[in-house]
Each structure stands twice: as structure tokens, then as C-alpha cells.
């Protein structure tokens, strides 16, 4: 019977006085240690130590991991190389590892994932910054920037202050048509754009024409007044 299947608690004896020889057979081959499960915060506190036999078990100071090909150690920021692991057999012995058997990683490689993750967070922050909605009440009215758009992308209606309207009315009283040089001067003085000054004067001229037409239609003609005065 192989030593892997020998149970030390099984009450048995060998004939011809070979009981002393049974104690000399090692339970595990050289180079392998028994795997023990220690109680952790995730398990019960009263766990019994159990021994298991497997062709590939490695016991480390921080973490114990069982596998068929390779074992890894977490906590020391290094891993075992698959090429350095020798295939274990019941009759063979494991290969002892030194410092040269570890794959060391530089801090740049270790924190590479953290850098990528922080970059994604920064990109999301910039996207939210540029895609944030701008409401009409958040826009600055009567600014020299000029164009103000509404909710649906249309140009909003320009509102003028009382001071701006008064100055424009004064200018319209003296000059119904402005040169470009004068238009630029008024725009700079009232903190408006040249386009806004031009549109205001166009609308004001249309209003003035409508008012004059209404006045001429209500007043009697000059010929009728002369006839009445001659009679």
C-alpha cells in the first residue's frame, strides 16, 4: 500500500514484528508540506486542522493556493513562473525555489490599471462638463458676444435696456440711416454688436413708415383744405 493512503489513525499492525518499520515511512514525500486550513474571518472559528494529499500543493506565508500546474502568491506583488514549476509525482520530490524564480513587476506596471482607471474618470468628467445643458436664464443678455440661442437652437429675441433704447431713439431722431463707421461706434458704446444695431434700425424704420401711413390716411388731403379755405 502506498504511503499516500496510509491513515495514521487506522488501528492496524503488520505481521512478523514490522510495526516499527511502518513509522519510518514518510506520509509526504520530501519537499512537500501538509496543507492546513487556518480559520479566517469568513469561516468558523473552531475549524479543525485537516491534511490533504495532492500532487501539487505549495504553502506560502500569506496565502495558500492549490492547483495542478502553478501556484501564485498574493501580497508580495510577485508571481511564480509557470516554466519553473516541475511536475510532481508521488515518488518524486518538488523543486525548491529561490529569489530568481519570482517574476517581479515594476511599480509602473503594478499601478498601470489605476492610471487607466483615473484617465477614464477624468474623460467622463470632461464629457459631463461640455455636455451640461445651458438654460436661457443662464445666458448673459446684452453682452458683446452677440448671438444668443434659445432652447431649440433658434436665435432668441434680443432685449434692450432702457438706457440702450433711449440712446438708439436719439440717434434715430437725427439719422434714420447709419454709416458703418457710426454703427460700430454706437455698438461699442452700448455694448452691442453691429448686427444688433443694424436690425434695430431696420425695425425702427418699418415702424416709422407704418406710423406715417396711418397719419396720412387719417388727415384730409391738402387740396380739400385749400378749397375749403377759398370758399
UniProtKB/Swiss-Prot annotation:
Database matches in CDD domains: homeodomain
GO annotation, cellular component aspect: nuclear speck; nucleus
Return the annotated DNA-binding positions. 153-212
Query: Which top-rank group of organisms is this from?
Result: Eukaryota
Biological process annotations from GO: anterior/posterior pattern specification; embryonic skeletal system development; regulation of transcription by RNA polymerase II
Note the PROSITE patterns from the entry.
Answer: ANTENNAPEDIA (PS00032), HOMEOBOX_1 (PS00027), HOMEOBOX_2 (PS50071)
Alphabetical list of SMART domains matching this protein: HOX (SM00389)
* UniProt-recorded Gene Ontology molecular function terms: DNA-binding transcription factor activity, RNA polymerase II-specific; RNA polymerase II cis-regulatory region sequence-specific DNA binding
Q: Where is this region: Disordered?
A: 212-231
Localization, UniProt: Nucleus
Mind telling me which Gene3D superfamilies this protein's record contains?
A: Homeodomain-like
Q: Any idea which UniProt keywords this protein has?
A: Developmental protein, DNA-binding, Homeobox, Nucleus, Transcription, Transcription regulation
Q: Where is this motif: Antp-type hexapeptide?
A: 134-139
TM segment ranges: none
The keyword Ubl conjugation is assigned to this record: no
Protein task: Sequence-specific transcription factor which is part of a developmental regulatory system that provides cells with specific positional identities on the anterior-posterior axis.
- Family of this protein: Belongs to the Antp homeobox family.
**Which PANTHER family does this UniProt record tie to the protein?**
HOMEOBOX PROTEIN HOX, HOMEOBOX PROTEIN HOX-A6
This one is known as Homeobox protein Hox-A6
GN (gene name)? HOXA6
Amino acid at each position: 500500500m502506498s504511503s499516500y493512503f496510509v491513515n495514521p489513525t487506522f488501528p492496524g499492525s503488520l505481521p512478523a514484528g514490522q510495526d516499527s518499520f511502518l513509522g519510518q515511512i514518510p506520509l509526504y514525500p520530501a519537499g512537500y508540506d501538509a496543507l492546513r486550513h487556518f480559520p479566517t474571518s469568513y469561516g468558523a472559528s473552531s475549524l479543525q486542522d485537516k491534511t490533504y494529499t495532492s500532487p501539487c500543493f505549495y504553502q506560502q506565508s500569506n496565502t495558500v493556493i492549490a492547483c495542478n500546474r502553478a501556484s501564485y502568491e498574493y501580497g508580495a506583488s510577485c508571481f511564480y513562473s509557470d516554466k519553473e514549476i516541475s511536475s510532481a509525482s508521488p515518488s518524486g520530490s518538488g523543486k525548491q525555489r529561490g529569489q530568481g524564480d519570482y517574476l517581479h513587476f515594476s511599480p509602473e506596471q503594478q499601478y498601470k490599471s489605476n492610471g487607466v482607471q483615473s484617465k477614464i474618470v477624468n474623460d467622463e468628467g470632461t464629457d459631463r462638463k461640455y455636455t451640461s445643458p445651458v438654460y436661457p436664464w443662464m445666458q448673459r443678455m446684452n453682452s458683446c458676444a452677440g448671438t444668443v440661442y434659445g432652447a431649440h437652437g433658434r436665435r432668441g429675441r434680443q432685449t434692450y435696456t432702457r438706457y440702450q433704447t433711449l440712446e438708439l431713439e436719439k440717434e434715430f431722431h437725427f439719422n434714420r440711416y447709419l454709416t458703418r463707421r457710426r454703427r460700430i461706434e454706437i455698438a461699442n458704446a452700448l455694448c452691442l454688436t453691429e448686427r444688433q444695431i443694424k436690425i434695430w434700425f431696420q425695425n425702427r424704420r418699418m415702424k416709422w413708415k407704418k406710423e406715417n401711413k396711418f397719419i396720412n390716411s387719417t388727415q384730409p388731403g391738402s387740396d380739400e383744405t385749400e378749397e375749403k379755405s377759398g370758399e
